[in-house]
Amino acid sequence: MTADNALYIPPYKADDQDVVVELNNRFGAEAFTAQPTRTGMPVLWVERARLFEILTFLRNVPKPYSMLYDLHGVDERLRTNRRGLPGADFTVFYHLLSIERNSDVMIKVALSESDLSVPTITSIWPNANWYEREVWDMFGIDFPGHPHLSRIMMPPTWEGHPLRKDFPARATEFDPYSLTLAKQQLEEEAARFRPEDWGMKRSGQNEDYMFLNLGPNHPSAHGAFRIILQLDGEEIVDCVPDIGYHHRGAEKMAERQSWHSFIPYTDRIDYLGGVMNNLPYVLSVEKLAGIKVPEKVDVIRIMMAEFFRITSHLLFLGTYIQDVGAMTPVFFTFTDRQKAYTVIEAITGFRLHPAWYRIGGVAHDLPRGWEKLVKDFVDWLPKRLDEYTKAALQNSILKGRTVGVAAYNTKEALEWGVTGAGLRSTGCDFDLRKARPYSGYENFEFEVPLAANGDAYDRCMVRVEEMRQSIKIIDQCMRNMPEGPYKADHPLTTPPPKERTLQHIETLITHFLQVSWGPVMPANESFQMIEATKGINSYYLTSDGGTMSYRTRIRTPSFPHLQQIPSVIQGSMVADLIAYLGSIDFVMADVDR
């Protein structure tokens, strides 16, 4: 499928005021309090009593906001720079995305500590289910009407809500952990699945259902991921995905690290994405700081991000083919990944987790001889992709296992918050590198691979074609690498250019302070989304004018992708579920953070 047949995506409209006019016309300007931010979208505060009505309007307006992109909370109690905003102890925000407008809007509602409840919106957007569960889990905010408001990241027996400001952030602030036999039995009992809790029946009219645990330790679960299957024979009647086993508190960690020292933690979100994880974070921090990086920095960042797109997709390809029964290709794809990592290691000094991007630039300049390494890889990979396509992807057995399996359309994808190859496999031509170019992607020539059926096979083929386009982008970076510095000339560039510290005492002082305490960012909010390896990844940062983030919201693509599983796989066979899980391309750190 080509872009000519796809849904038309208009040019990106940052800070789109059209929706503000529509809202004012419908509800009156007095219903909203506008908040100036550096998020690139209108941010509007509304009263809780009108929240559901306003969100329903946005969902049904002409050119609707079909996707609930994100929903989460903020503990406002210690925030000092609120700039005349509505009084709030806690805030719940709703980030809505319209494909047909190519614009976003954020709605916020203020809550007092004595009345922490907001009506559920699961009847408007089905993917609000998990987001509301996480907000309750992390902040203790209630959502009346929610079908199953329960822990999602933390264990069922957990006490407290970790993202509250009064909840400890370090292990040393807790009592020493011990696991007694009684506590072990309590935890095991809490993990027991009870169908009635999820509205499931144990038997039908003429059959008894079997309930099967797939995971949390199963090779086809691709990580610490558990799915409880309700089976009639081998047919899946329903299922309940169970996540949180890989949760490490990444957003809590961000509140205790400086803006600079949090960069290595971003690598551990999608741990196959490498520097791709650094990019939305440093771009969002640079928006706060007002830093414009040199052109060379943009090109270097794009080149290395595309290298990691390729390494991630190669791992996906090998393991996906292995999931459906072919054992050999994974060894070949790992050989190709090693060739890519040879280039990555030569340039960054590291392999999987380089933590190489910096606020205002990159860690160091490109080494001598980098062009030959890149050229050798660019010449190598296309022929290998041809082999994979011919030998494996055109194989009749693989097609029989994946064509028509776990299919969904564009409307369903948007309702569940699906992005990346999963969305483009339905024919929706929405790739942020084209639709909302960042870091200079508008200067590169490449195509957006699309498919039409939205099934397990199409999701695979889209990623294979994406690797070909990444090679084109890397080749253009290699041939057109600009001259110039690899860091911005800005006071908040961290660390500052080292050469100047040997000549100017002011720069030496700045270097010392920014490395020890960290740079001080202006009080504001910023947001940046990118087209990451598994879909759209973004960082929404709140600065209170300090050396650390007041609130860091990490929105990952894999979280909504797993939430969609029950709606897609009902009525299919267990073997189809394995093919479906492989086609999603997820890692649990990207889900659980």
From Swiss-Prot:
Chief location: membrane
EC id: 7.1.1.-
Region listing for NADH dehydrogenase I subunit D, in residue ranges: 208-593
Keywords: Cell inner membrane, Cell membrane, Membrane, Multifunctional enzyme, NAD, Quinone, Translocase, Transport, Ubiquinone
Bilayer topology: Peripheral membrane protein
Catalysis: reaction(s): a quinone + NADH + 5 H(+)(in) = a quinol + NAD(+) + 4 H(+)(out)
Subcellular location: Cell inner membrane
InterPro entries per the UniProt record, alphabetical: NADH_DH_suC, NADH_DH_suCD, NADH_Q_OxRdtase_suD, NADH_quin_OxRdtase_su_C/D-like, NADH_UbQ_OxRdtase_30kDa_su, NADH_UbQ_OxRdtase_49kDa_CS, NDH1_su_D/H, NiFe-Hase_large
Enzyme kind, highest EC tier: translocase
NCBIfam families named in the record: NuoC_fam, NuoD, PRK06075.1, PRK11742.1
HAMAP family (UniProt xref): NDH1_NuoC (MF_01357), NDH1_NuoCD_1 (MF_01359), NDH1_NuoD (MF_01358)
Family according to the record: In the N-terminal section; belongs to the complex I 30 kDa subunit family. In the C-terminal section; belongs to the complex I 49 kDa subunit family.
PANTHER family the UniProt entry points to: NADH-QUINONE OXIDOREDUCTASE SUBUNIT C_D (PTHR11993:SF45), NADH-UBIQUINONE OXIDOREDUCTASE 49 KDA SUBUNIT (PTHR11993)
Name this protein carries in UniProt: NADH-quinone oxidoreductase subunit C/D
Organism from which the protein derives: Pseudomonas syringae pv. tomato (strain ATCC BAA-871 / DC3000)
